[in-house]
Amino acid sequence: MLKGLSPLLSADLLYVLASMGHGDEIVLADANFPAATHASELIRLPGVSVARVLDAVLSVMPLDTFVAQGALTMQVVGDADAVPPAVADMQAVLARHGCSPAGSLERFAFYERAAGAFAVVATGETRVYGNVILRKGVVLQGGNE
């Protein structure tokens, strides 16, 4: 445990976040996501919702503001405009952290993009479509407050 940090930020997750450079991507995945298949580095946070993990990650990592969307969710198959509850919760977390709303990718495009991610965090999220790709932004000298 460390002061001032979410207990969800395990040593492994902090190491990955610190090792990532500007433009690197990390996937926060639900329990149904084929995380082991797509992960070059796999971190497991069982029993924790994707929104809680997103909140913890955004407390220490800025999203990339040099791209249209620093966060991307998976579109609902057959209804690209649908907003599942897990995605609505993630959008609320993004807004709370002052981030732009997440964009979305078609399911197989999401899987393809996830395969190139720096790491995948397998959460305990049981709701469908609880997946998001985060693109790391620039950490400014003195922080991004």
Describe each region flagged by the PLM:
Residues L72-V76, V87-A88:
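Surface-exposed, low-hydrophobicity beta-strand/loop segments enriched in small/polar/acidic residues
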Residues P46-A68:
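Long, charge-dense
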Residues L5, A29-A31, A36-H38, L45-P46, ...:
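Fold-independent oxyanion-binding glycine-rich loops
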Residues M1-R44, S49:
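Long, hydrophobic N-terminal alpha-helical segment
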Residues D24-V27, E41-I43, D64-F66, G70-T73, ...:
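Structural motif
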Residues A80-E145:
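Glycine-rich, aromatic-bearing surface loops/beta-hairpins
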Residues G4, P34, D64-F66, V138-G143:
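Conserved phosphate- and dinucleotide-binding cores of soluble alpha/beta proteins
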